[in-house]
Amino acid sequence: MAAEQLNGYVLHRRAYRETSFLVNIFTLENGKVSAVVKGVRGSKSDKKSLLQPFQPLLIGVSGRSELKNLQQVESTGAMIRLAGQALYCALYLNEVLNRVLADEIPHPEIFVLYQQSMHALVAQTNFEPVLRSFELGLLDALGYGIDLTHDADTGQPVADNGYYRIVPELGCVYQGDIRLSGCYSGQSLLNVASENWDKDSLLAAKHITRTTLGELLGSKPLMSRELFKQTHFKSRGREL
């Protein structure tokens, strides 16, 4: 059987049996693909050196089951170079995608979003808007996006001077003109919807996406988030 050619990035790699790897690769054409890479552990093969996160790849896979055989791999461009906080953010993106994407369901819009987000992490020093935009785009693409511009009960446009509560699987619901615990200002929600970032809209977006993504990710902690907490970034009051 001829190998199917796919463009993608490694999301996760782990040891498998004595000499092999299991890799999860996010591809443009087929979404997340899981594959066995045989006979590369402990060697200096090109496959092993190329199967790294943030390296754009062209891979060749074969097999009829969900677990493919990776037959070939080559670079299609320079590795995206990340360091410090940007690296932790990129590892977070990889881990989220690896956890929430089902095998072999194409998501070309998420693939483009992922590439854009990775390059934005390289180019910017304020990473939080990149993460929040990625999370919102991911939720929208998976069908879990929340309409932050209209009241879920009445259908009326969100009022910038009102306060709203986010109801899971429903949307934002008007609570009155006085701020209550757990509510967000209409202006903050409108800013999140338009990705017009300031301190309040970033905080609102973090709470909203963490709640919604949490349902998809499950109860197991994200390793990238735990690693981030163990670094000096915690002392600066930052978290993913």
UniProtKB/Swiss-Prot annotation:
Domain of life: Bacteria
Any Pfam family matching the protein: RecO_N
Coiled coil: none
GO BP terms: DNA recombination; double-strand break repair
UniProt keyword list: DNA damage, DNA recombination, DNA repair
GO cellular component: a single term: bacterial nucleoid
Keyword DNA repair included in the entry's annotation: yes
Biological function: Involved in DNA repair and RecF pathway recombination.
Similarity-based family: Belongs to the RecO family.
Name listed for the protein in its UniProt record: DNA repair protein RecO
Originating species: Pseudoalteromonas atlantica (strain T6c / ATCC BAA-1087)
Upper classification of the organism: Bacteria, Pseudomonadati, Pseudomonadota, Gammaproteobacteria, Alteromonadales
Gene that specifies this protein: recO
